[in-house]
């Protein structure tokens, strides 16, 4: 990796062939007057620079975000040339701003400015931008506390396939096929049984699950479905939306399995993953723990107050990230 970066800095085209880096140095070091020690020194300097980026917690997260966003390491190194560490951080932060909101460093970033842009973000085409905002929210949350030594697990984030998940399912997520309906009801039934809730509802769910396939029609499913939504207070479709304040990052496997589950079932699953040591992004965990609502009344419901609290924290954290001096603290 190090030799590849040095060779590319010398002008080698990336991805030419699997031996391109070897051939580059072989040709360069066999030239008359080649300075092998100077070449080795350039490799060591690169290693020291990358090590500094890793050790410095703020650089680690800034560089990590930009590399995830597709930035070239050598281009980031070029930003550091002739710059103090403080100036380098500012340049990196400007790059993050450009990637996230498509504006230059001279933009007047106020809390209202952030709010206007986040309010306009909706689930759909261009989901990579939403991933970027939610990833940055996690990184900025970690960075705001200078005393914390927590680091975002970029390795886990890179190796797993990460999806955008609705905190509260939207109306079109109603399970359609019988298999999906059974799985959806079984998850609700398991939650109700573990929480010792809704005995009558449990019985109705079990009755539908036991129906012969010919009798398990949509007409039979819909009344049970509506009763489950009513129990979990998710029968008001207007409360759920595709805005970013109803979205979090979740691993692909969990998202595909639980995408249309009620909030309480999703919450139980996410907290189970966290307890088992499976990587769950901090802010996803905070959302399902309802950390962004100062007055938590019902942990198994996702309410308008929860959404509004999430919105305010997201705005505040990103505003602080782009304007706060704590990034240098």
Language model: regions and residue ranges:
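Flexible coil/loop and intrinsically disordered segments
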Residues: 1-329
